[in-house]
Structures are given as C-alpha cells and as structure tokens.
Amino acid sequence: VMARSWTPQARAERFEAAQRERHELADRIGRTLAAELNDRQVEGGGWHHQVAPVNFVSVLLEHPSGMSLSLVHEGSYRKGAADRRLTVRGGYPSEYCGWRAEPMTVGIDTSATSKARQIIRRLLPSYQRTFVAARTMQQRVQ
C-alpha cells in the first residue's frame, strides 16, 4: 500500500528516492569519468572517484599525485539547460592561497568522453601549472 502523496511518509519516501537517484548519478559520472581519464593516461592514470554524502550531485576525482577535481551541481535553482551543469574545480593543498585555475562547467547529461575532453582542454593546462606552483610552495614551507 502506497502512502498518500501528501503525507509526511510519502514526502520522506520521495526525498529518499530523489537522494538515491542523485547519489547513483554522481557515482556513474565519477566512475565513467575516472575511467576516461585513466584510458587517456591523464597524469599517467591512477584516477579514482568518491561520491560526497550530500543532497546534491557532488563527485571528487583523485589522483595519486595529490591532484583532484571536484564536480558539483551548484545550480539547482537555475532553469532549463543551466540546471543540468556541473561546476568543475581543481583541488589544492588547504594552506595554498595563490593563483588557482578558473572553474568551468560541463553538462551533467554529456558523455564521459565529452566531459573528459572538455576538462583536458579547458581546465587541466592551467590547473597543472597552478597545482605544481602550489606543491612547490608547500614543499618550501615544510
């Protein structure tokens, strides 16, 4: 027996189903994008993903070198195609406060191949340069 659509139980069930769906989407995006970066030997491969336990799509791609890329759905208030975008940012050591690569967006619904191509072309060149600077600065401080 299904709960009536307006009851607290029904709302909770819808919320949990939507949360499960977002988590599965994030896992699929992370898994396929990590595989794509590894297939393309980006930074020699070794990328893996983690899904953040939050109520929106949030994936962290991590590399053994310490590099990381976060893909986060930040625009749930947006309408139309703008609502179907993920913001991609490079990760840096927490104590680093220098220049950072400019974030970019990719379509949630685009293929992993398309996402990887866009990230490699638009974000990675500046991220690699600024990440090396951050690591150099971090090593000097230690």
Language model region names:
Residues M2-H63, T130-Q142:
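Negatively charged, low-complexity tracts enriched in Asp/Glu with abundant Ser/Thr
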Residues Y127:
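Glycine-rich and polybasic anion-binding loops at the starts of cofactor/ligand-binding domains
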Residues V1-R11, G44-Q118:
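Intrinsically disordered, low-complexity regulatory segments enriched in Ser/Thr/Pro
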